[in-house]
Amino acid sequence: MRFFCARCCSFGPEMPAVQLLLLACLVWDVGARTAQLRKANDQSGRCQYTFSVASPNESSCPEQSQAMSVIHNLQRDSSTQRLDLEATKARLSSLESLLHQLTLDQAARPQETQEGLQRELGTLRRERDQLETQTRELETAYSNLLRDKSVLEEEKKRLRQENENLARRLESSSQEVARLRRGQCPQTRDTARAVPPGSREVSTWNLDTLAFQELKSELTEVPASRILKESPSGYLRSGEGDTGCGELVWVGEPLTLRTAETITGKYGVWMRDPKPTYPYTQETTWRIDTVGTDVRQVFEYDLISQFMQGYPSKVHILPRPLESTGAVVYSGSLYFQGAESRTVIRYELNTETVKAEKEIPGAGYHGQFPYSWGGYTDIDLAVDEAGLWVIYSTDEAKGAIVLSKLNPENLELEQTWETNIRKQSVANAFIICGTLYTVSSYTSADATVNFAYDTGTGISKTLTIPFKNRYKYSSMIDYNPLEKKLFAWDNLNMVTYDIKLSKM
């Protein structure tokens, strides 16, 4: 049976569903292979194409209502398919965009990664070069240090041998001088006058003459110009007979030799031995930073240049802590006050052992009778031409300065003097030729040496000798009888003062 699709397959301004119906008709036509196409004008003269296809299944044409139902179903299917197609197109566009982005990322990422790796590699190479440079510099510095150490050891060995030779020659010279004093030296043609044999008076030999100094120079292998020199007080003195003692009349400007590196050096004590013993010399210097509660380190410098540059040759660790700035070095031993005690201790520097301890009877300590600047300066040791002294106060003396002469071997008190100078009214004190001198202020730039107490007469007097506190915090002032100078510690700075003495 044939199915006639003249109405549904006509071309005109119909809906898209009609076109789909036409497509379906064509499909059916292809499937049935019995489609017939016709062309004719309608009543209005409009051209129409019609075709007919035999249904493969239906024996008769359905009703018009059934055809419309089929058309509606086809329209719904067409709309659904169109929506699915649009969704598919949207997904395809999204996939194409994503694929394009992925393609660009894959093209760009290797380049960025490569650039980052190149930068990292460059950084690592620079760091490697820096490390290699630093390594070479450290190796060079280490080699230099080893070489310097070797040179210093050789120099130290040479100096030790030289010191031993000098010590032997000095001993030989001393024996020769003693023999000359006993009158065993034959008289020469240049002798100006006869010398009484056996005379022990220095003035008999007229030691101030140039001839004797030249003779002594040859015996000791020391230039005569070094032995015969003008003392700071302005008169000639020699190594024998004339101690150069007198009354203090002038104190010079401070000369700064060294500045402490840290706050622990705010105040301290430094010194040289006025009576050096082997292996120490006149140049050997000791320094103690006294800020702190457990002060035990004593820095030792073989040469003055080492002291000025801050390179210690040795560091002593004391068996017990010391107190304040009253320590001194004398005849190869360090004398100091034990912390929080009235005990004075003798520490032999060469053997690093304690040789003697002694309590100072009734002496105030740890802030009972300090100098005006404080610092637990109750007990202050001093050295002069006569030997070792201790400056302190007691309850009996009611705060006045007490002065005692000490035996340097066993620290026994040999003699004691009580002054009328209140200890807490003065900033510091030192002893020259058996006379105690005090300083008025530790902060004033224009302080004075304001009192003197002569142990020979037991008389004190006021003075007005100018004394400069250049750095305005003098915590230690000591006299060195060998160098005829004052050593001081002024607010981190280690300084010396030239002095002049009136000839006695």
From Swiss-Prot:
UniProt tissue specificity: Detected in aqueous humor. Detected in the eye (at protein level). Widely expressed. Highly expressed in various types of muscle, ciliary body, papillary sphincter, skeletal muscle, heart, and bone marrow-derived mesenchymal stem cells. Expressed predominantly in the retina. In normal eyes, found in the inner uveal meshwork region and the anterior portion of the meshwork. In contrast, in many glaucomatous eyes, it is found in more regions of the meshwork and seems to be expressed at higher levels than in normal eyes, regardless of the type or clinical severity of glaucoma.
Disease: Glaucoma 1, open angle, A: A form of primary open angle glaucoma (POAG). POAG is characterized by a specific pattern of optic nerve and visual field defects. The angle of the anterior chamber of the eye is open, and usually the intraocular pressure is increased. However, glaucoma can occur at any intraocular pressure. The disease is generally asymptomatic until the late stages, by which time significant and irreversible optic nerve damage has already taken place. Glaucoma 3, primary congenital, A: An autosomal recessive form of primary congenital glaucoma (PCG). PCG is characterized by marked increase of intraocular pressure at birth or early childhood, large ocular globes (buphthalmos) and corneal edema. It results from developmental defects of the trabecular meshwork and anterior chamber angle of the eye that prevent adequate drainage of aqueous humor.
Site (Cleavage): R226, I227
Effect of R126W: In GLC1A; likely benign
Triggers of expression: Up-regulated by dexamethasone, a glucocorticoid.
Subunit composition and interactions: Homodimer (via N-terminus). Can also form higher oligomers. Interacts with OLFM3, FN1, NRCAM, GLDN and NFASC. Interacts (via N-terminus) with MYL2. Interacts with SFRP1, FRZB, FZD7, FZD10, FZD1 and WIF1; regulates Wnt signaling. Interacts with SNTA1; regulates muscle hypertrophy. Interacts with ERBB2 and ERBB3; activates ERBB2-ERBB3 signaling pathway. Interacts with SNCG; affects its secretion and its aggregation.
Result when mutating V495I: In GLC1A; uncertain significance
Domain (Olfactomedin-like): residue spans on this chain: 244-503
Documented effect of changing N57D: In GLC1A; uncertain significance
Keywords on record: Calcium, Cell projection, Cilium, Coiled coil, Cytoplasmic vesicle, Disease variant, Disulfide bond, Endoplasmic reticulum, Extracellular matrix, Glaucoma, Glycoprotein, Golgi apparatus, Lipoprotein, Membrane, Metal-binding, Mitochondrion, Mitochondrion inner membrane, Mitochondrion outer membrane, Palmitate, Secreted, Signal
UniProt entry tagged with the keyword Transcription regulation: no
PTM: Different isoforms may arise by post-translational modifications. Glycosylated.
Name assigned to this protein: Myocilin
Effect of N57S: Loss of higher molecular weight isoform
GO-annotated molecular function: fibronectin binding; frizzled binding; metal ion binding; myosin light chain binding; receptor tyrosine kinase binding
Disordered as annotated region, ranges: 106-131, 170-200
Effect of I345M: In GLC1A; uncertain significance
Ranges in a coiled coil: 74-184
InterPro entries per the UniProt record, alphabetical: Olfac-like_dom, Olfactomedin-like_domain
A Gene Ontology term for the protein's cellular component: Golgi apparatus
Result of altering A445V: In GLC1A; likely benign; no effect on protein stability
Gene coding for it: MYOC
Location of the protein in the cell: Secreted; Golgi apparatus; Cytoplasmic vesicle; Secreted, Extracellular space
Effect of substituting V53A: In GLC1A; uncertain significance
Effect after changing G244V: In GLC1A; uncertain significance
Consequence when changing T448P: In GLC1A; uncertain significance
Disulfide bonds: C245-C433
